[in-house]
Amino acid sequence: MSAYARALDALRQHRRETEDFDLRQAFGADPDRFSRCSAALDDMLLDYSKCAVSDETLALLDKIAEAAGVIERREEMFSAKRINVTENRAVLHTALRNDSTRPVMLDGKDVMPDVEAVLAAMSTFSEGIRSGTIKAATGKSFTDVVNIGIGGSDLGPAMATLALAPYHDGPRLHYVSNVDGAHIHDTLKALDPDTTLFIIASKTFTTIETMTNAGTARSWIAEKLGQDAVGSHFAAVSTALDKVAAFGIDESRVFGFWDWVGGRYSLWSAIGLPIMIAIGPENFRRFLDGAELMDRHFREAPSRENLPMMLGLIGFWHRVICGYPARAVIPYDQRLARLPAYLQQLDMESNGKRVTFEGESVTVPTGPLVWGEPGTNGQHAFFQLLHQGTDIIPVEFMIAARGHEPELKHHHDLLIANCLAQSEALMKGRTLQEAKAQLLAKGMSEAEADKLAPHRVFPGNRPSVTIIYEKLDPFTLGRLIALYEHRVFVEAALFRINAFDQWGVELGKELATELLPVVEGKKDASGRDSSTAGLVAQIAALRDS
């Protein structure tokens, strides 16, 4: 039996022995539980004390991390080893925010001069757009920028742009991703072609959704302003210079990145150009600096003080040992409304795998379902299930100590109170006796209280972690995203899978390409299953009616 299998067995045995672990009792018995079960990086604090873990649990998690080689794999990533084994690629998104004075060597070459050159080009272009020195074909300054991309070319920049809204002092930003024509139609109808710039974000310049939307945008500009205006109203983030040129975009407006940057890790690269246009190069650098600090923390801090390590170990405990199928991410910040969707891609596309990096079937459950909404909205939507449902779903709360609206401090105080109350309620719950006593205190009869009390019981003992930081600024957002990137890495190492490929998205794309001529009526559906053929026929009938 391998060291990994032994460590896994020990954790499972420990879970069987501690299934009656009670968080209420744990806090009652240990007044120092919070200080012992939390870790911090400057003002950013991770509290995992409301999870059913003990010192013994953490020691056993350390053993499986050692057996899985988490530390060794971490060093391989930072050292540019080709840990993306299915694509034979290094994984170097950390180089995008690395201090440029420290070389990052890949195949004998320092990648940092290229990284800095792209950042400098982005800065020059974004400042030109922001200041109005780079103008539209009409001679006017750009007032609106539309980023056209999908997946990592959309989710990250869209999330960060909204999150950093208080720092916007550039043109308005818009994001179009879905191939559904409604998305680009509804975006364009509110814009003036005279003052609209488009950024086409596609590494290969072949992504079908992106290029379909890009073609529509080009036609819109050509129709309104003439074909010669296209070059002035478009920029691209791509490595396919020939395809970009054929589209009508000059090479001076093309910003590249590298095959060692995965899409869902790419907002630090030229994919982040719309973020830089919104908040400016200086704030974008602060964003990178925050991530770089978390990188150093992840690499240098001891396990118990290491935020990504602890978040990953707790995540593994919940998913594999406790068997919880999902986790809810609840940022108590309306400007982080897109963060759950961003983390959904980061986590589920990375760790939704069933084969180890050695090509064998996994022996443990892998990535959980990740979902969420901002608080307090979620409290009035799905918290019912979190508190009283039959499935236990760990919750990850995050909250800033200070908001951006000092004149509305009472709003933020209420937001904080709700966040902390939900965390406390999940942990404490309410017993049948407490529920009945509360009803009796309200003047209800004994019989009525007996009837209603079971409905007002909260089982409690439901795990949550809370992340607190002073304020959501570019530096803090950089730290927060890097924290979750490295958490996903830790869990992938514990699952023994490759977090950096995404073959699961390919089959559907291949079949969509085959089905398009069938949907268009250019081919029949012969050879397809009866369900797909029947659905095509029904759609055709509805179109003809």
Swiss-Prot record:
CDD domains: SIS_PGI_1 (cd05015), SIS_PGI_2 (cd05016). GO terms for molecular function: carbohydrate derivative binding; glucose-6-phosphate isomerase activity; monosaccharide binding. GO terms for biological process: gluconeogenesis; glucose 6-phosphate metabolic process; glycolytic process. It catalyses: alpha-D-glucose 6-phosphate = beta-D-fructose 6-phosphate. It is found in: Cytoplasm. Its main location: cytoplasm. Its EC number is 5.3.1.9. Pathway: Carbohydrate biosynthesis; gluconeogenesis; Carbohydrate degradation; glycolysis; D-glyceraldehyde 3-phosphate and glycerone phosphate from D-glucose: step 2/4. One of its GO terms (cellular component) is cytosol. Keywords: Cytoplasm, Gluconeogenesis, Glycolysis, Isomerase. The active site is at residues 349, 380, 509. InterPro entries: G6P_Isomerase, G6P_Isomerase_C, Phosphoglucose_isomerase_CS, SIS_dom_sf, SIS_PGI_1, SIS_PGI_2. Pfam families: PGI. Belongs to the GPI family. Catalyzes the reversible isomerization of glucose-6-phosphate to fructose-6-phosphate. This is Glucose-6-phosphate isomerase.
